[in-house]
Amino acid sequence: ISCSLVGSEMCIRDSLMVSVADRFKGNNNFEYDLVDIVRQALAEKGRLMQKAVTAAYRAGDKQLFALASGKFLDLILLQDKLLGTRPEFRVGKWIEEARALGDTPEEKELYEWNARVQITTWGNRNAADYGGLRDYAHKEWNGLLKDFYYMRWKLYFDFLSQRIEGKTPAEIDFYAIEEPWTKAANPYSAEAEGDCIEVAKQVMQAVE
């Protein structure tokens, strides 16, 4: 899928931002906008790639399905890397701020659980499966993309791959695979990692 299909205006805008990025290196406002704008282009590329995955599945083209779904998953990891270069787009910052509200270890754990639930299942199984609240917050954040969304998409693609092969896999219980993340206590750093300008250049190469 070429850059032209992602949207000419979006590509021109993002290419211009990246082309002058080195001149504004260290400018906090520019670098924030750069990451946010390039993130949008990457998300749009992912949306189009998802359409390619769907088309391949409906056509029963196993090879094309594997190729398209693999590229889609790679885009998730690339976006996770991009967003990790800014603290504002890290799930670690969200969790850190939530835990800071607690005075005792028990309160900190409770606030972290609430923070994790709010951006994923929004509550228990009833809320997620029957209340229409799963992904209500819809956050594109470093850490969340790699450890939550990537896992879920890969499981779904594996399910569809088996269907293409003529197998009858069990239906996916998404809540059962999502809930463990909401109850986990694995640490996420709130500190930015990597050079946002260099990663933005990588993203534009992937989009174009």
PLM regions: where:
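C-terminal amphipathic alpha-helical interaction region
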Residues: 35, 49, 62-208
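Short amphipathic alpha-helical heptad-repeat segments
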Residues: 38-49
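Conserved, mostly hydrophobic/aromatic
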Residues: 17, 53
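Repeat-mediated protein-protein interaction surfaces in helical alpha-solenoids
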Residues: 26-36
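Single conserved hydrophobic/aromatic residue that forms the stacking wall/gate
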Residues: 1-7, 11
